[in-house]
């Protein structure tokens, strides 16, 4: 359904800016000397850490550049490669609040920008402005992830284009106000296709992202499926009781089968594939 902003802890606007530095090698297990800003304490809307998560080197670097230098980063990859989870797990370790909005659902312009609500105050009906998810996020230390970016409706994309343009400033004409982004607001997106539309016809409902939209993303990175070894490792980490000689071979075979479905999907012979999530529930 449409994004529900009521369950966000929006009642307090945090005056927080990053107050901790994290070492990329220690925090994400990737081989690079890099210190990245984050928060020392948990804030509302920080994702939970999955200790077994395996970070992809290039995707992690791209997303960390987004967090450290306020770059707009888009992660592209086939269904099931775990694009949004990757961003969330980085945010979790930086203790950076992170919110995902799936653009292929029924998200409207009003959901993003906000609307006037009629409320009762001291027995009188008055109209009061309620921020939408985008207007709220812009004013907070939040990493906002637009999922399925290539499936967004034109009216919604038009709104997003506005914040990609003017240094992130957003003008609300009805409200007669300009929202300037919080210094720790970050913007990410995930897409199934590299903005080229979908030549295979696999992704129903994906629009071609126009070049103007693509150029405004500072970094576009591609996340592919894991190698058989890495994916097997993840499954064994998540289900330790399978970590014995006999079951190990079985899990590796399951992963190989899943890989075949992905190859078939890429070449257009199959219309569905087994994502790592599917293999995990099968195991």
Where in the sequence are the language-model features?
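Residue-level recognition of alpha-helical structural elements
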Residues: 247-250, 272
